[in-house]
Amino acid sequence: MGPEEVMVQASSPGLISATEVLVAAATFCLLLLLTQTRRQHAPKGLRSPPGPRGLPMLGSVLELRKDPHLVLTRLSRKYGDVMEVTIGSRPVVVLSGLETIKQALVRQAEDFMGRPDLYSFRHITDGQSLTFSTDTGEMWKARRKLAQNALKNFSIAASPTASSSCLLEEHVSTEASYLVTKFLQLMEEKQSFDPYRYMVVSVANVICAICFGKRYDHDDQELLSVVNVVDEFVDVTAAGNPADFIPLLRYLPSRNMDSFLDFNKRFMKLLQTAVEEHYQTFDKNNIRDVTDSLIEQCVEKKAEANGATQIPNEKIINLVNDIFGAGFDTVTTALSWSLMYLVTYPHMQKKIQAELDQTIGRERRPRLSDRGMLPYTEAFILEMFRHSSFMPFTIPHSTTRDTVLNGYYIPKDRCVFINQWQVNHDEKLWKDPQAFNPERFLNAEGTEVNKVDAEKVMTFGLGKRRCIGENIGKWEVFLFLSTLLQQLEFSIQDGKKADMTPIYGLSMKHKRCEHFQVKKRFSMKSSN
């Protein structure tokens, strides 16, 4: 056979097609066999969780492409609070129902406190993140507690100014005052504006002040670079990473994954610069911020016998990364959704402002100690968290050992999704859950928030993996919102409408709105 004949035969569509079919069929059979082999059968007397069968190799991935929180909520009505779906080649247990989730994350916390070994998680701070790490041992617990304490201590530490009771109040007050001035300036210049761009920088400034003891000018390129890369992270992860569930995709080009890796590299470089500056100027007699506090632990604890509380130098950057993340995107998104609800329901805005005027007046700014005296404001914030459910799922969990939940056998290392959206819209818990109604959280007199109902709202997870920035985040949202509403009235341009349709992602955003307007309510007479 001559060279030309070989080339003609090799390029024959019929032969190539037959070869491809045979290879595809063999691959299909092999992967199907592997998938079936990987599925662990329940021990005698126990059942595996029910769920949809899905397609070979793809599982339910096609069903879950759009609004997976809604799809999984719908499936839970058919299969129950403990069900199993297959995403790609990975079996995933999905938990719904508040009591079932509490049973798993609180009462059986040790069983469900793991993180799955997802491909994307390995690239966040080189797999050493407290939040995303698969580690659950004593060292992880000690470092998590240390980070939690550092964040709390430098938020509630006494403020040097008389107008604020703690550093968090001082930082938020500074940023909220800037926003009031900026929003009024934008009204004069443009007659309408998008508040998100300015709020995100102010929230970043608060967490920078807590972590690095530094407030940046809003046009500072260093601060803007932090904001931009965090925004990119949210955009990239919003699409999800299919390679987490279909391993074959790890070896194929992916623009999303390239962007994800690039973000992690740039963000770590920014944090590394800040931490190195703190090392160079560290003074154990003058602990300035969270980073100094962590360095102090690293320096002072080296001589102690308990190695679990020691932090290697390189781990400090990872802890700062976790603390920064805990106080940034959630607060920004909560404030953004709050403003959308306020302009959509202006009568609720007026009720909050009446409460602020009556309780605080116009002589001073709101403080954290005012929260208990502002029940309607607190109820509005709770309803914003519940109704928007902008964190539809927690970060995925995994089982640390073989366990049983509600009579269903769940093997070790099983990926677990927690459907927070389902809990927040469960008709068994909430009357008319699709309605936005802050009064649902108030007693009959409207004078107190019902704490039992408040604790049913899921935003920050539960149990041993609960977000370390939960309390700080709630405090920030309260202080920003009450300070802005004390001084400004928000509205939408005539003829325009705020689009409240959620856009699915790591945290669900709404479409950006450029039609906000503000009006000054009064001039602040005093800052005391």
Curated annotation (Swiss-Prot):
**Per its UniProt record, what CDD domains does this chain match?**
CYP1A (cd20676)
Task: Extract the Pfam families matched here.
Answer: p450
GO terms under cellular component:
endoplasmic reticulum membrane; intracellular membrane-bounded organelle
**GO biological process entries:** cellular detoxification; cellular response to mycotoxin; response to antibiotic; xenobiotic metabolic process
The subcellular location is:
Endoplasmic reticulum membrane; Microsome membrane
Q: What is this protein called?
A: Cytochrome P450 1A5
Q: Which EC numbers does the record give?
A: 1.14.14.1
**Which species is listed as the source?**
Gallus gallus (Chicken)
Entry's family note: Belongs to the cytochrome P450 family.
PANTHER family, alphabetized: CYTOCHROME P450 1A, STEROID 17-ALPHA-HYDROXYLASE/17,20 LYASE
> GO: which molecular function terms?
arachidonate epoxygenase activity; heme binding; iron ion binding; monooxygenase activity; oxidoreductase activity, acting on paired donors, with incorporation or reduction of molecular oxygen, reduced flavin or flavoprotein as one donor, and incorporation of one atom of oxygen; oxygen binding
Required cofactors, per record? heme
Q: What is its main location?
A: endoplasmic reticulum
Which UniProt keywords are present, listed alphabetically?
Endoplasmic reticulum, Heme, Iron, Membrane, Metal-binding, Microsome, Monooxygenase, Oxidoreductase
Induction description: By 2,3,7,8-tetrachlorodibenzo-p-dioxin (TCDD).
| UniProt-annotated binding residues for heme | C467
